[in-house]
């Protein structure tokens, strides 16, 4: 196993522990808590994949961080912060909409890269909107936190979420996954539109009907794909 992989996991575990202590003091805002929950799942998946104990890794990560801080000057810290581009966190969904449990009568699931696509194929003839919480850098989608499909009545009928064991995805991965979800929902004569925020930063465009550019042939192909997979 590569030593950098192990040490990276150890540092991530310790930094998550610090953030959790911060949240326990009720100091974290909604985006902070969203990332904390997501990263907890990711660390569990990575720990299982690597065969490493999280508690032991956290202690080792603390030693690494303490050693770095001992060598770090205030001036070097200022320069590092200034050179890193800042990302923004955008929210279509409330914390309640993100954390709400939902159930599927006819569940379908597809894994596309590091993203998991889930939808209820029992839903028919509904108007559906896709909402997402994600981070943006350089006016482009950076990281998807969670995307969910809602009916006009507020019911959740679909979802795209990062796989905890496979961190990392691009805006193209997200667009492809959205295409799969749209194709699957439209297969049952649902009308699907995407939030303006997601259109703007994923596709850098905004259509009046709320639909991102997706060729009809690609839509039909994606619909058949998700229908054939469980």
Swiss-Prot record:
A motif (Nuclear localization signal) lies at residues 34-38. Pfam families: Flu_NS1 (PF00600). Residues 1-73 are annotated as: RNA-binding and homodimerization. InterPro entries: NS1, NS1A, NS1A_effect_dom-like_sf, uS15_NS1_RNA-bd_sf. This is Non-structural protein 1. Transmembrane segments: none annotated. Residues 180-215 are annotated as: CPSF4-binding. The gene is NS.
